[in-house]
């Protein structure tokens, strides 16, 4: 077997005819592996950059959503107060109109006051402000809704509301002002 014969077969173990071919093939293989590794690295770097960009966009979107939510809450508070104040304007108008009348009789004043009170109660009701008005003799004292001014001897059972000195008010199950009451003393 001569190395110069082109028809000569390669040795089966290595498949190379010479050491130079083997070194060249290994160099090509290493070069190919390096090229593949560099291509994989470039692909991973591109994917990493894409994910970093997606993260930054998602973070910016979350920040914007948080800012919008804070703005909406601020506006809702402002407009809630605005709507409540607007519902009280007719009451103020009625009071001012009543004060303008110079020769009003007691009956006129009472009638105007009752009409104004109805307007005020309607405005409170529209804004979900409900009265806390316990029924004397039947309502049990509730420290969450009532404030006991005194404990008095009574024919009622202990801890029953005897009199209501001032109604209380609540909004959305939150007490704005407790009802001022007297409570029956234990017997």
UniProtKB/Swiss-Prot annotation:
Keywords: Chaperone, Cytoplasm, Stress response. Homodimer. The keyword Chaperone applies. It comes from Albidiferax ferrireducens (strain ATCC BAA-621 / DSM 15236 / T118). Belongs to the GrpE family. SUPFAM superfamilies: Coiled-coil domain of nucleotide exchange factor GrpE, Head domain of nucleotide exchange factor GrpE. GO terms for molecular function: adenyl-nucleotide exchange factor activity; protein homodimerization activity; protein-folding chaperone binding; unfolded protein binding. GO terms for biological process: protein folding. InterPro entries: GrpE (IPR000740), GrpE_coiled_coil (IPR013805), GrpE_head (IPR009012). The lineage of its organism: Bacteria, Pseudomonadati, Pseudomonadota, Betaproteobacteria, Burkholderiales. Its main location: cytoplasm. PROSITE patterns: GRPE. This is Protein GrpE. Participates actively in the response to hyperosmotic and heat shock by preventing the aggregation of stress-denatured proteins, in association with DnaK and GrpE. It is the nucleotide exchange factor for DnaK and may function as a thermosensor. Unfolded proteins bind initially to DnaJ; upon interaction with the DnaJ-bound protein, DnaK hydrolyzes its bound ATP, resulting in the formation of a stable complex. GrpE releases ADP from DnaK; ATP binding to DnaK triggers the release of the substrate protein, thus completing the reaction cycle. One of its GO terms (cellular component) is cytosol. It is found in: Cytoplasm.
């Amino acid at each position: 077997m001569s190395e110069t014969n082109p028809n000569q077969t390669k040795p089966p173990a290595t498949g190379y005819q010479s050491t130079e071919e083997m070194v060249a093939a290994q160099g090509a293989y290493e070069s190919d592996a390096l090229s593949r590794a560099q291509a994989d690295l470039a692909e991973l770097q591109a994917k990493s950059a894409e994910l970093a960009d997606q993260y930054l966009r998602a973070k910016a979107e979350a920040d914007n959503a948080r800012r919008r939510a804070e703005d909406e809450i601020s506006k809702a508070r402002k407009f809630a107060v605005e709507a409540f104040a607007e519902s009280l304007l007719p009451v103020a108008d009625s009071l001012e109109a009543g004060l303008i009348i110079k020769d009003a009789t007691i009956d006129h004043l009472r009638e105007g006051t009752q009409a104004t009170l109805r307007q005020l109660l309607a405005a409170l009701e529209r804004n979900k402000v409900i009265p806390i008005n316990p029924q004397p003799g039947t309502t049990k004292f509730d420290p969450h809704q009532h404030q006991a001014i005194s404990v008095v001897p009574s024919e009622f059972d202990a801890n029953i509301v005897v009199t209501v000195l001032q109604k209380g008010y609540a909004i959305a199950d939150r007490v704005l002002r407790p009802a001022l009451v007297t409570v029956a003393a234990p017997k």
